[in-house]
């Protein structure tokens, strides 16, 4: 695939989906997706993202009460819904993930460092959520990311008793082109950027 084709597939031609075709996404594709997105960079390789791929009726029914009313239909229709979370105790894995600095875990441990650890987890987990979307599109999947849901309800349903918190959710599958909205405007370089 040529560079422009790939950029179109991931960015310029890709659209946030509002409806889905009933084409299943096999578990092997979800593994391939994770095995690609995990290579995106994070601070000290902290890799705090934690994912739940909701694909069963039981999982959907756990998810349903947390959704904003306007998001229920499209979310329930998605072949897979990824709950993109982040582990606030990500640093427990750092001895394995960042082995050349044995002291790195201590940067985040302790009551006085909770805010720093939480900020690091949220920031880098969000980065990884972006990598998830780019990787999914590169693999031929469409995405429908959204934040119209109750985080506390999702955390209770899927992450109770853990140090994982939800960030956003993202439908994955093959979008229904009939349900895609017209592309909204984007800010120009001059509106969004400065050269210093």
From Swiss-Prot:
Keyword set, alphabetical order: Flavoprotein, FMN, NAD, NADP, Oxidoreductase
Entries under InterPro entries matching the protein: Nitroreductase, Nitroreductase-like, Nitroreductase_HadB/RutE, RutE-like
Annotated CDD domains: RutE-like
Species for this entry: Cupriavidus pinatubonensis (strain JMP 134 / LMG 1197)
HAMAP family: Oxidoreductase_RutE_HadB
Pfam families the UniProt entry points to: Nitroreductase
Similarity comment: Belongs to the nitroreductase family. HadB/RutE subfamily.
Full protein name: Putative NADH dehydrogenase/NAD(P)H nitroreductase Reut_A1586
Cofactor(s) needed by this chain: FMN
Heme is among the record's keywords: no
GO MF terms, alphabetically ordered: oxidoreductase activity
EC top class named in words: oxidoreductase
Listed EC numbers: 1.-.-.-
């Amino acid at each position: 695939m040529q560079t422009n084709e790939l950029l179109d597939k991931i960015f310029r031609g890709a659209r946030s989906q509002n409806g889905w075709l009933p084409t299943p996404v096999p578990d092997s594709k979800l593994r391939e997706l994770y095995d690609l997105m995990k290579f995106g960079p994070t601070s000290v390789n902290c890799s705090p993202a934690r994912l739940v791929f909701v694909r069963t009726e039981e999982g959907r029914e756990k998810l349903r009460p947390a959704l904003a009313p306007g998001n229920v239909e499209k979310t329930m229709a998605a072949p897979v819904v990824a709950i993109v979370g982040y582990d606030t105790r990500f640093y427990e894995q750092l001895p394995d993930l960042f082995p050349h600095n044995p002291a790195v875990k201590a940067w985040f441990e302790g009551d006085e460092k909770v805010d720093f650890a939480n900020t690091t987890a949220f920031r880098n987990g969000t980065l990884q959520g972006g990598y998830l979307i780019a990787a999914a599109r590169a693999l031929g999947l469409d995405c429908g990311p959204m934040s119209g849901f109750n985080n506390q309800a999702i955390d209770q349903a899927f992450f109770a008793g853990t140090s994982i918190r939800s960030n956003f959710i993202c439908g994955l599958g093959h979008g229904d082109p009939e349900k895609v909205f017209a592309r909204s405007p984007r800010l120009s370089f001059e509106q969004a950027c400065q050269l210093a």
